[in-house]
Each structure stands twice: as C-alpha cells, then as structure tokens.
Regions:
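Polar, acidic low-complexity tracts enriched in Ser/Thr/Gln/Glu with frequent Gly/Pro and Thr-Pro motifs
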Residues: 45-237
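Positively biased amphipathic helices and basic secretion/translocation or surface-docking motifs
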Residues: 8, 12-56, 69, 233
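N-terminal acidic, proline/glycine-rich, low-complexity intrinsically disordered segments
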Residues: 1-8
Length: 237
C-alpha cells in the first residue's frame, strides 16, 4: 500500500508543480549495450585523396616506363622542364586536394574553394603554355611529319588527357559519393581539372609536338574539357 501511495503522491505532486516523476533507472541490458559501444572511426582528411591520386598515377607511370618519350626531351632546357613539371604537378595536386580534402574544422569539401583553385590552376597553366612554351629546333616534331593537321594533333592529345582524367573522375566520384549534397558541380570541376592536369603532366614527357598553338589547344583545352566533364557529372539540381 505504501508503495502505491507514494506513486499516487508523486503523480499528484507532478501535476500540481509541473514536474513529472523522475524516470526509471536504465535497464541492465541498456547499460551493457552502452558500455560495449566503441567510437566510430572518422574519415581521414588525406586518406581518400591519396587513394585517388595513387589510382590515377598508375596509368601515367606505366606509360612513362614503357615509353616512348618525346624525341626532343633531352634537348629541352632543364629550367623549363622543371617549371613545366612543377606547374602541371601543382595544378593536379592542388585541384585534387580542394575537391577531396575539407578545410580544417569542416566535414565536407568546400565547393567555393574547389572551384576557385581549379580555375586558378587552369589560368596558370594556360599562361605558361601561351608565354613560355619552348621547342627544340630540329628535334621537336611538327604535326605534318605524321601526316596530321594541327587540329588532328590537338584531338589526339585531348584524347590522351581524357584517358588519364577519366580514372581520376571515376575514383573521385566513388570516394565522394553522398558527401557533397550541394555545390557538387564545383567540386566536380576541381576533380576534373585535377585529372586534366595529370594528363597534361604526362604530355610534358610524351607529346612530341611543342608549338604554342598545339600545347594550348591540345593540352590546356584538354584540362578545361576534363573540368567541364567533372562539373557535369556531379551536377545536382
């Protein structure tokens, strides 16, 4: 009786004061379940980007090992070659990082930063191609030597860039699935620009054509088209 009376008193007091009776203690099963839980392993900031980069580098590495390399490679100025590798390589690394790695304290990549980095990378390599492309007289090849027009040589190199970029795009899209609810097209643009820059880096070593027109229309345009493809693939209404 006393137990029932206390329950009744608690209910009456709760209604009068607006304070309900205290909840019952947790069951033994609930306590055991809580004690057995383990912290969820969070995504690393660089792990996914590193995996995508490694997957994308496999193809170019195989091509460089088996060759052939451009016939004028030995005659190119060392400073120019270092600058070209640094610029195309930085465009690849920075674009990929902006698409895959959130800023410190964030959970998801920042679309605005990704698009800005990608556009800056494309502008820099375009200016380098326009203003600093070099050839080696007597060693650099002209499209006519293969029976090609300038347009045909550019289409060939755009195709090479596309083959490299598609690997980065597929690997990146898999890694980023369901992680970019908004701004996906801008992240996709950065991802495509990264793939295009990696293709351009490969062409530094294997493309025999060294005219400014070819490098701009074949290599840089290839990167731009890869960025557009990435934006379209990740476009979300």
């Amino acid at each position: 009786m006393s137990g029932g009376g206390n329950d009744f008193d608690d209910r009456v007091l709760g209604r009068a004061t607006g304070v309900d009776a205290p909840p019952p203690p947790p069951s033994a099963e609930l306590l055991r379940a809580v004690e057995s839980t383990k912290p969820v392993r969070t995504r690393t900031r660089f792990g996914a980007a590193a995996v995508v980069a490694l997957v994308g580098l496999v193809g170019p590495a195989i091509v460089l090992v088996h060759g052939p390399l451009r016939r004028d490679l030995a005659g190119l100025p060392a400073a120019w070659l270092i600058a070209a590798v640094a610029l195309w390589g930085s465009a690849f690394a920075l674009s990929l990082a902006s698409a895959m790695i959130p800023r410190r304290g964030d959970v998801l990549p920042a679309p605005s930063r990704a698009s800005m980095v990608a556009m800056a990378a494309m502008v820099v390599v375009a200016l380098f191609a326009l203003l600093a492309t070099v050839d080696v007289p007597g060693q650099s090849m002209l499209p006519a030597e293969r029976g090609w027009t300038l347009f045909e040589s550019c289409v060939h190199c755009i195709g090479t860039v596309a083959k490299v970029a598609v690997v980065i795009l597929i690997a990146g899209l898999i890694a980023l699935r369901r992680l970019v609810p908004v701004g996906g097209s801008r992240v996709g643009m950065a991802l495509g620009a990264a793939g295009g820059a990696l293709g351009g880096l490969l062409l530094v070593f294997i493309c025999p054509f060294a005219s400014t027109a070819h490098v701009v229309l074949g290599h840089v345009v290839g990167m731009v088209l890869a960025a557009i493809a990435g934006a379209l693939l990740m476009f979300r209404k």
